Amino acid sequence: MIRVAVIGGSGYTGGELLRILAVHPKIEVTYVTSREYAGKPITLVHPNLRGFYNMNFSQFSFDKLGDKADAVFLGLPHKVSLEYVPKILEMGIQVIDLSADFRLKDPTLYKIWYGYEHPYPDLLKKAVYGLPELHYEELKNAKLIASPGCNATATILAGAPLVASSLLETYKLISDVKVGSSEGGAKPHEGSHHPERQNAIRPYEADGHRHAAEAEQELSLIAKRDVKVSLVPHAVSSVRGALASVHGWLSSDISEMDMWKKSIEFYKGRKFIRIIRSNIHPYPDPKFVIGSNFADIGFAIEKRMQRITMFSAIDNLMKGAAGQAVQAFNISRGFEEDEGLRIPPLRPA
């Protein structure tokens, strides 16, 4: 059994990690920390986990971590992970970091998108971007996994078959992402407070969301050329789910059947990708992936405008966060990638 610690386990992502890991047959959760709730039961914060955890949150200590863990999931805010990752790696413990601190390979991008100089450029080179559909082989035996952001995940999974197809007139894409309120975290603030969020469809960071940097990095690798992404997220009143609509312009005609085949071929063998095309539900809808690690992919072609739109629907807390982190961890350990994740979506949701 792999001993696993969850550092920062009181938020929505931490709770979702604990939900998945509670039924993972190859791991044992041995250490869960929270600054705010240290000494209090995990089930006080996550009552849905009653009957699965009979332990309290702990105050973090490097000494205790060394005695208790073979791998660590970090559910900490951006910049805070920087205080933990180097020391944990020095201790010989694997790190799966769910913050943005090690996602970008170019250290200069951190000043542009996050407002700070990255202090560990060498670790950026060693970190593996934890999107298994693109980095399966690199994840094997990875010691530092940088788990992608939810808006970036949805955008990349939608855009990847398109940029791989060599069909675009321009490699400037527009990604419109609708995302549920759980993306904002467990701590309420004015923008995410339920009476303010309910019935809202509210753009935010419309002049350039920082997850665009991840999308550009990954899509450029696939296309083998520079890809630019304008990513505009919208806050909606649902709790879970993210839908990315990625718009591009075609250089030549392509039939729906050919695009269907290209999408299927690109994601061949990927357990959590479902290519969607049906009469009743012709396009992906987050409603049908809630509670699971699946990503539903689809597309539409507007021939009049030579426009193609690729769609991706995910649960932002699963494929957009905790589920994907566990999927990447599984691959790094030589487990089946769906270990602990064989969970069908909820319905109704």
UniProtKB/Swiss-Prot annotation:
The active site is at residue 150. It is found in: Cytoplasm. Keywords: Amino-acid biosynthesis, Arginine biosynthesis, Cytoplasm, Lysine biosynthesis, NADP, Oxidoreductase. GO terms for biological process: arginine biosynthetic process via ornithine; L-arginine biosynthetic process; lysine biosynthetic process via aminoadipic acid. It is an enzyme of class 1 (oxidoreductase). GO terms for molecular function: N-acetyl-gamma-aminoadipyl-phosphate reductase activity; N-acetyl-gamma-glutamyl-phosphate reductase activity; NAD binding; NADP+ binding. Its EC number is 1.2.1.103, 1.2.1.106. Coiled coil: none annotated. GO terms for cellular component: cytoplasm. SUPFAM superfamilies: Glyceraldehyde-3-phosphate dehydrogenase-like, C-terminal domain (SSF55347), NAD(P)-binding Rossmann-fold domains (SSF51735). It catalyses: [amino-group carrier protein]-C-terminal-N-(1-carboxy-5-oxopentan-1-yl)-L-glutamine + phosphate + NADP(+) = [amino-group carrier protein]-C-terminal-N-(1-carboxy-5-phosphooxy-5-oxopentan-1-yl)-L-glutamine + NADPH + H(+); [amino-group carrier protein]-C-terminal-gamma-(L-glutamyl-5-semialdehyde)-L-glutamate + phosphate + NADP(+) = [amino-group carrier protein]-C-terminal-gamma-(5-phospho-L-glutamyl)-L-glutamate + NADPH + H(+). InterPro entries: AGPR_type-1 (IPR000706), LysY (IPR037535), NAD(P)-bd_dom_sf (IPR036291), NAGSA_dehydrogenase (IPR050085), Semialdehyde_DH_NAD-bd (IPR000534). This is [LysW]-L-2-aminoadipate/[LysW]-L-glutamate phosphate reductase. It comes from Sulfurisphaera tokodaii (strain DSM 16993 / JCM 10545 / NBRC 100140 / 7) (Sulfolobus tokodaii). The gene is lysY.
